[in-house]
């Protein structure tokens, strides 16, 4: 047989000349349905691609994508649980099944449908033209627990002739292989099963003995057939029979089984011709071998896929019966008879292979041209997009530059305006300084003559004396139509030294909301004029001098904060800090709204800072301590050194007096004793009950702060600005909240809000001719029947009414406050 193929070389040109016309190759195709089993994995994409390559060129082909969904036996609930399907839930289960099937189609099968519906390039061999077609696609989702049973039932029910399933190359011993074998054994004889795997494509078809046959490559099958016949010539069937009998297992099992595969793969008519000569056999065999060598493995596998060879079903029975004769005992005679009587078939095979090669060459040329055109189109699109991108970037760059230029101009203009304003301000300040330098410096307080002081105080009348101090007496006076307080220093303290002039000049410039304002002075006689404080001193109010009203607790907390803020201002004053030295309740004055202001600042001590840029103060040493005994710093009494912590000690004593309403003598010991056991009852016993209901937590916090301020050593006392003032600010918020809640309580209207006729608050107050105020409606009704005053009963001179806007505004304010 080898000599037959070697000596029968057929010239390719002669083979091409013997090819039939292209019009003979274009046979009309019948409608065909190809079923594809889709699992959703990457193997399904391989199945789709293979099916498109094999059947996608047919016009009347329909792809039916089949997916097997596990049988639904449970239903999900709204709470996230699942329930079994019963007869009562059958309608709900049907709706749920329909929803699941539809979602499966949308999410799993739709992407594969889009792959199938892509446009395919089809070559018309008769006209050498190309056209674009679409593959029709149907989606089918089946519900079953057995994939093989469901697919087999669908194929047999709809008489599907082609079934394509996927399988991995390692799946021979897995469950996937069992499914494939089960499907192949169960489908009808009219259906051809294609198994697409990584190793190739297997065609499974049923023969008369229901055995499975695999075909991975037509070329490999043909080579195996050729090798089985290479032991002798084509006509010498006895030699072939002896070879088969000498080794029946290898030849019968391996080679003879491939013979039906060859015939099925090429799908040619099984016509018998006994008149063919040996030379013709050799030529046809060599031509077939040459065609097999020139075609690629992919082309060899594709021989059985060409629509021109779809007559395999017509000859399946004949091939199956021929394949069944290859048994161990009957090998030699059928094989020899086949090669002897079917030389025409081999000749036909070589012709068809040549035609197939020519068709593949044309297809390859068309593919190359299509790819080249697509590549050129993509290049043109890419160049167009690149050009558009460059243009867009250029426009964006220009716009960005314009925007940056505009921002830069605006920024420069703003800087220019700011520089001009700054220069103008500096010029004005310079002019002011120059003007002030040309004029002799003046003191920043008003100077009063001694005669004005004497006249304002009625020659220092005892009736106008409102206070007495260690440095002088205080009188109430009226200077320039302004009520003020004049403090006249004793003769021993009125020497006008340079130090007094310096202190007077500096203190006249001090302005703080909680420091008594220095209005003026009479330097010749040592008189200082301050603003008048209506409610006197804190000491008088604490001890209720002249039966004055007690101060509520929330006002006391606010006073503590106000005094602390004034002390911080004095200690931070520039150029030299000021220490009060004589801070006590008698020197804290209250105005008509109980706003506290620290007085007697004019006789305080100014100390120099160690460094002009530093906030640390040097101790000031004075040989003779001044101040009130209970408020003097113990360290100052012992060493004569004074510092800002000296005022902190006096401030702590004032807080203790605000809490208890007692004298300062031994007050520290009393509060410490009450605070030792952390007993609220003991603390409440020492508090001033006239101040109202003290809040325990805030009161305990304030008492602890006061005890820290009264420590014997100054270094143990807290810092006024960093430690004391923040605590007092938080307590002030509590006090303000309590004051607001108290003022929000409804109050009784004043008597002048009432109408003399209605005995109720007036809505529209008006003044009548008798001078009294009435409600407009009430007085109008009165004057309709009377011409006398409702109050005096005297005749009314007229009936005119004048609106009392002032009283009306007061009534409206009272109503709003009490809503």
Swiss-Prot record:
Residues 748-819 form the U-box domain. Residues 460-728 form the Protein kinase domain. Residues 208-309, 398-433 are annotated as: Disordered. The keyword tRNA-binding does not apply. The keyword Secreted does not apply. Residues 223-237 have a biased composition (Low complexity). It is an enzyme of class 2 (transferase). Pfam families: Pkinase (PF00069), U-box (PF04564). Keywords: ATP-binding, Coiled coil, Kinase, Nucleotide-binding, Serine/threonine-protein kinase, Transferase, Ubl conjugation pathway. Residues 278-296 have a biased composition (Basic and acidic residues). One of its GO terms (molecular function) is ubiquitin-protein transferase activity. Residues 395-437 form a coiled coil. Residues 238-260, 297-307 have a biased composition (Polar residues). InterPro entries: Kinase-like_dom_sf (IPR011009), Prot_kinase_dom (IPR000719), Protein_kinase_ATP_BS (IPR017441), Rossmann-like_a/b/a_fold (IPR014729), Ser/Thr_kinase_AS (IPR008271), U-box_ubiquitin_ligases (IPR051348), Ubox_domain (IPR003613), Znf_RING/FYVE/PHD (IPR013083). The active site is at 582 (proton acceptor). One of its GO terms (biological process) is protein ubiquitination. Pathway: Protein modification; protein ubiquitination. ATP binds at residues 466-474, 487. Its EC number is 2.3.2.27, 2.7.11.-. PROSITE patterns: PROTEIN_KINASE_ATP, PROTEIN_KINASE_DOM, PROTEIN_KINASE_ST, U_BOX. Functions as an E3 ubiquitin ligase. Belongs to the protein kinase superfamily. Ser/Thr protein kinase family. This is Putative U-box domain-containing protein 53. It comes from Arabidopsis thaliana (Mouse-ear cress). The gene is PUB53.
